[in-house]
Amino acid sequence: MWGFFHAERSTMESLTTYFSENILIQRIKSLERKVGHTPLVRISKIFQRKGVSLYAKKEWAQLSGSVKARAAYQIIRRAIEEGELTQQKILLDATSGNTGIAYATIAGLLNIPITLCLPENASKERKEILESLGAKLILTSRFEGTDGAQERARQISNSDPSAYFYADQYKNDNNWKAHYFSTAPEIIDALPGITHFVAGLGTTGTFVGTGRRLKEFNPDIKLISLQPDTALHGLEGWKHLETAKVPQIFDSRLADENHEVKTEKAYEIIRSAWKHEDLYLSPSSAANLAGAIQVAQTLKEGIVVTILPDNGDKYAEIINKIL
């Protein structure tokens, strides 16, 4: 994994020229084939129930190694096509890490400068990857989480609007549209009989975009959103919406059910998935899987699908203590 990111950095450093608007658009379009198209795997060892199947989408099998490649690509592409983002502007946003890595990977390939605001307690691995990709990092209070990072990004953008394109992933409709146009169709093509979709809430883009498209395909599909059980949790990237700033793209009407996941349960899944499913999961991926298992265990029949946003490579500090 580290080799992958260093390879991206080497590519980035070789881009020293400015492109015409048409060339820039062509280059961003050429990256489309590297985003999405991720495999669905059946979870068959740690969950077994007659009549019920559980599948998980391995989102690290794409550019930048996480589900956030989808939203980052959609946001950047639309901004370039609409003339809001050029090589003369700085791409700016708040992130807990993965969106930033996706932004920095794509921006680097397009020779677009990037500044990211993220909480100071983001994992060491994430910070090192972001810096290796050429991103300027502005660290914000760990106690304010991504809410504090958003506020800092907003202040920076307001201080010099002409210098920045503020992507604002928590407000940008291209976040959820990325999943509406890619994640959901991939699931439908692979598993047209899906009965339940389960996903955690962070920016909420994955749940909102995928959920909307699935409901259009089949209104009987049940959508289950997941949150941490408390504001003080260890699920990096997830939001406890009762105590955090609710993203503007969130649609509270979508979910048929809302479930909570304990951090400790996610850590248990990290261990069992590694031992029995040969899956090296991040805390948020394990939390999604924990929530999906919780749902699947209540069913007599059905096909349950969840998302594995990324693997454990960027969380060695945490995972080495768990395994």
What are these regions (language model features)?
Residues M12-L323:
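PLP-dependent amino-acid enzyme catalytic core
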